[in-house]
UniProtKB/Swiss-Prot annotation:
Keywords: Periplasm, Signal. This is Probable chaperone-like protein YdbL. InterPro entries: UCP025560. It comes from Escherichia coli (strain K12). Probably acts as a chaperone-like protein that contributes to, but is not required for, the formation of the YdbH-YnbE intermembrane bridge. Affects the function and the structure of the YdbH-YnbE complex. Overexpression of ydbL causes a negative effect on YdbH-YnbE function. Pfam families: DUF1318. The gene is ydbL. Disruption phenotype: The deletion mutant does not show any growth or outer membrane permeability defects.
Amino acid sequence: MKKTLLLCAFLVGLVSSNVMALTLDEARTQGRVGETFYGYLVALKTDAETEKLVADINAERKASYQQLAKQNNVSVDDIAKLAGQKLVARAKPGEYVQGINGKWVRKF
């Protein structure tokens, strides 16, 4: 329960960051990035701006996952996968997510 509450607080923080969220939202709606079940973004377009955004966000996510894992005595991979499931589930229509089979699909 504690792990879920901490993860929810982390996810709210990700979305509410004014500068990052707007840029991330734009990238999502433009089909430039996609969410995975592993908790990290993937650049679907290989331009420098998109790749930098993905690298920056994934670095922030990894740091948060490491902190949560340490606090809850679980693996970083477990935290990342839990976050990934929630991020994929919360993706809006038109945004890309990677299915369990590894294929990219646009949510509808």
